[in-house]
Amino acid sequence: MNRLKCISSYISDNEKVLDVGCDQALLSKLLARRGVYSIASDIKANIIINAKKNLSDLEKKYITFTLSDGVPEGVDQTITLVLSGMGTYTILDILKNSKVFFNKIITISNNNHDILRSEMIKLGYYIKEEEIIKDKSKYYNLIVFDRIKREYSKEELLIGYNHKNKVLLKEKNEYLINKYNKILNKTNNEKLINIVNILVNYKY
């Protein structure tokens, strides 16, 4: 639930949201309580059917459901796109196949955040801000992208840009340093050594 609340905090009351891979549409239900309209989309029909069950009258008013394997037709760039709970390459595939160029995208990918940042820039999306979320002892990286061009350092592409929770960022980085050092005790990997050096010398 921490992830949903964090995503919601980056969405203003006047936005409309498209949640691709909506699962149980919990984000849409959370937004509905604030009077925010959303489209809950998923590739699996049974997920949509289950998500529609036991909706309150308020939720029915603010949530539209659609079956789609990516960005559904009928949306435009003014809608805020949420891509959460999926891998980096799935996120990139969805965007590469989309006919819409969004003004704002919120992601929580499961892996390869450095690749996500670099590839999103190639697609014309730029990192606005980030936040580390800790949920059930796991760390998640929320990234907000927009279309305002910015330049980023090698360090920022690896660790992130404009982090909002430096305490959790430091905690996550220390976890990664310990994890990578255990690997380096068994094998000498130059790329991993460079990553550890960047993490160790990062200025919070």
Please state what every model-predicted region is.
Residues 1-13:
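Conserved alpha-helix/loop element of class I SAM-dependent methyltransferases that forms part
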Residues 3, 72-73, 89-204:
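Class I S-adenosyl-L-methionine
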Residues 14-23:
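Conserved class I S-adenosyl-L-methionine
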Residues 25, 29:
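Glycine-rich SAM-binding Motif I of class I
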Residues 32-33:
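Gly/Ala-rich phosphate-binding loop of Rossmann-like dinucleotide-binding domains
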Residues 37-42:
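Conserved SAM-binding motif I beta-strand of class I
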Residues 44-46:
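Conserved SAM/SAH-binding beta-strand->alpha-helix loop
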Residues 49-75:
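S-adenosyl-L-methionine
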